[in-house]
């Protein structure tokens, strides 16, 4: 059978997860799966949220509209862009996607650019998707060092803040100035910040940057309200040509995103019951994350060359232990060589771990 080879490799994170599960099964011992990329402190309680959903309704049981259920897109605008007038035009700025990764892949597919700039420390899937879509890519060291005057409308810059894998958070003023500077130059900015609302839910940053042209926002709900199994995200963009092509690709790639998932997430972000549920979920999750990060600091496991005097924000942290060392101590982790394109040998002595687990369990292994 003749096939088209993507030249991308299978996800290391998935492979490590399989290795950890196999070891736990074979040894009968408990392993701490910090290789994962999901919140695992507590589950969000949907008991009161789903009470208002009619599982026998037509809306629940049939295909959703191509761009997403209209009331859900209205709720997204209300949650992320509260100063924006909700009308036919603004509703077309929001397209519902089955999670964050498909959103990013669609963006990479659609943009006709000569080069995509990723951060030095980056989620490995960025480059894998670019490879599959045959997009050239390179890297920048930090937001502050991006040389805007050397870029033009043939460049796309990905910004992940707080960063995955490091958890480094750039100040909002620096972010805002750089996004404005880049977009005014015609550079396309893809803002991928799925962990922000876990910690900063009531801020207006998304609302503020939404005024810029040449900006695309990709979002994954699972990083701040849980429910990764529902596969729910969205793309925000004001460019009509981009949205027209996105509408076509959404149709032929997905033919609508799960109606039940949209209805559940809509109620989580828009109803009193849902807001109470995700507020509790976020509070408990953040409390445990902060305790875990403090433990890493106390044990001097956070590399100063990455963090200096700062602490990571988000569900990930980098520590001064290798993937193999941690595995020998029954901890699943992902070597930092999977999150850089250069100097892989050097960074292989460090690992990214997920710190979004119960503190008692985390403390037991460290």
Question: Model-flagged regions — what are they?
Answer:
Residues 193:
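Walker B catalytic acidic pair
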Residues 7-99:
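N-terminal small-domain helix-loop-helix segment of the aminotransferase-like
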Residues 40-45, 165-168, 197-198, 224-227, ...:
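Short catalytic/ligand-binding loop motif for oxyanion handling, primarily in non-cytosolic enzymes
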Residues 33, 279-293, 300-321:
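Conserved glycine-rich beta-strand-loop-beta hairpin in the small C-terminal domain of fold type I
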Residues 52, 75, 79, 214-283:
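Conserved core segment of the aminotransferase class I/II
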Residues 70, 82, 171, 328-333, ...:
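PLP-dependent enzyme catalytic core of the Aspartate aminotransferase-like
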Residues 59-182, 196-212, 216, 359:
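Conserved core of the PLP fold type I
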